Regions:
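Short loop/turn segments at secondary-structure transitions that flank enzyme active sites
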Residues: 34-40, 152, 176, 194
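Long, intrinsically disordered, low-complexity segments
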Residues: 1, 97-107, 143, 147, ...
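Flexible, polar/acidic helix-loop-strand segments at domain edges
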Residues: 7-110
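Structural register within alpha-helical repeat arrays
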Residues: 110, 117-119, 124
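Intrinsically disordered, low-complexity Ser/Thr- and acidic-rich flexible linkers and loops
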Residues: 127-134
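Short, flexible helix-adjacent loops and helix caps
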Residues: 123-127, 155
Length: 261
């Protein structure tokens, strides 16, 4: 999304396809390595070929040397969340973490609690402006708490005024705030959207680099910015369930396997 709190596809967001990394939600920059970002600081060990290819920058444009689908990026982006930029073979920042980079992830974050509260209240207490008994926050307030911390504008009134509009923003908020923390599959199952378009596809960002701003890559200019489908997931109704162990099902004739399995 955009820093102003709107999704990219909202006309009022004014998403600029020539400068697609400008004025985005600050969490994008914290979570994602995008084209032109300097990911290697120490270039002293570079070979002549590495210097020529300028591999210290994430060359994620279409055809760039960070777009090898076998071991780099299929999507035009790389993961930055949980991974300090200096953790690479040239900067050797991983040495500060011992023999290997260890990631500590909480079982439950406060942001997740706010989002669960917002979803439950909006659906169970009459809408986005409702509060749960004994609580001071509305569903919208709870989401805005998270956005305030992240430096993003509040949920726009056109989304906060209806349950459908609010849920579209809440689903997006969970995707952004809890990105790469293992929630999305079960979120989509809970919302019964696992088998629905566009949640069944994965896309790549394809573009040509026109001008790289090495000082501030958010200002870099591109052309032919577009999305292409690279994966279509063949989920079906059975994936709203999980299979029971065959050994458990075989214990009692009355214990049936879950539908579709």
């Amino acid at each position: 999304g955009i820093k102003n709190g709107l999704p990219l596809n909202d006309p009022d967001a004014h998403f600029d396809k020539e400068h697609p990394w400008r004025d985005l939600d600050p969490r994008f920059y914290a979570d994602i390595t995008y084209d032109g970002l300097q990911v290697i600081q120490n270039t002293a060990k570079f070979t002549s070929e590495q210097k020529d290819k300028q591999i210290q920058y994430a060359n994620l444009y279409t055809g760039g040397n960070y777009r090898d689908v076998k071991n780099e990026s299929r999507t035009g982006y790389l993961l930055h969340k949980f991974t300090p930029l200096v953790v690479n073979g040239f900067d050797e920042g991983f040495r500060d973490y011992g023999d290997a980079l260890t990631i500590q992830v909480s079982w439950m974050r406060l942001s997740d609690i706010y989002l669960m509260y917002a979803e439950a209240v909006a659906n169970g207490y009459g809408g986005p402006s409702a509060k749960a008994d004994g609580c001071s926050l509305t569903a919208v307030d709870a989401v805005n708490k998270i956005r305030e911390r992240a430096g993003v504008d509040d949920v726009a009134s056109k989304y906060a005024g209806s349950l459908d509009g609010f849920m579209s923003e809440l689903r997006r908020e969970r995707a952004v705030e809890l990105a790469y923390e293992g929630h999305r599959f079960n979120d989509l199952r809970r919302w019964l959207l696992l088998t629905e378009y566009p949640y069944t596809i994965k896309t790549s960002q394809e573009f040509d680099r026109v001008e790289l701003d090495k000082e501030d890559p958010t200002q870099s200019r591109v052309s032919n910015f577009r999305e292409e489908v690279i994966v279509t997931r063949n989920f079906s109704e059975k994936h709203y369930w999980l299979p029971l162990k065959v050994s458990d099902v075989n214990i009692y004739p009355e214990l049936y396997q879950n539908p579709g399995w």
